[in-house]
Amino acid sequence: MTDYSYRSGTANFWGIVAVFILAYIFTGGMLFGSTVSRLEPETSNRMYNIRFIASIVWIIGTVVTICIGFDALAGWTVCVFLVLMILSLNIYSEPDYYSQRIISEIPDSMYNRFCKFPFFTGVVNGLVWIALMVTLTAAVALGGTVLFLKHNDFMSVVVLLIIFTLHINAHGLFANFYRQIFVGDGKKAGVGQIAFFSFVLTNILSAFLLNMFFRSSRLSEGLLMFVNPFYCMSYHSDGIIVGIIGGLFWFGAGILCNIKT
């Protein structure tokens, strides 16, 4: 059996330790910052500094892990995707009109406004920022497999993480739909309906991708059955209960992120 453990004296041991420390700081800082930002007045662009600092940390972490080696880069990539999954639920609790007001208050050129748009507070802004981060992280992972001459199995894991992020975005959309239709004043019913249909279509699309790329993967069978009821129905008819429980779990997480906003 192959030994994947790391011990003191093993090649890249302290590099791996540094990566995990950096990842913990990155994750904890993002969660703490996004939580504290909600206590600020609504007149402030509360997510700008958080996303900007996170982008700088991402650049530093990526450069450091590339210098250490492929194992460090792989671990960093997984940690980044986990943070993006958490923030995917968080962004749907942001009032979307923030972006329109803030972008009109900044007396800069249109070029500067366009470059700063992903960092502004707002649902659309958050989606753009996460999409950019996912794309850049996947591109770095692909470049790492080529640079370090590794097998493409790692890219299969990256595709799996992208699909997983897609799932959680779908549940965040559905939680936002629930809040606007059943909890809010009902004035955003059109937005809520779009969110609902996006939730359904996203799940169907991700189920199709799972069947295409991971039909025989035990990882997708064990992990993603917990996430997507549509995938359960297409893969194992008796696994629908697991999928429903997983769907309720992520739906509850999305509702919690939408409370008090």
Say what each PLM segment does.
Residues 2-261:
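Transmembrane alpha-helical segments and their membrane-interface loop/helix boundaries
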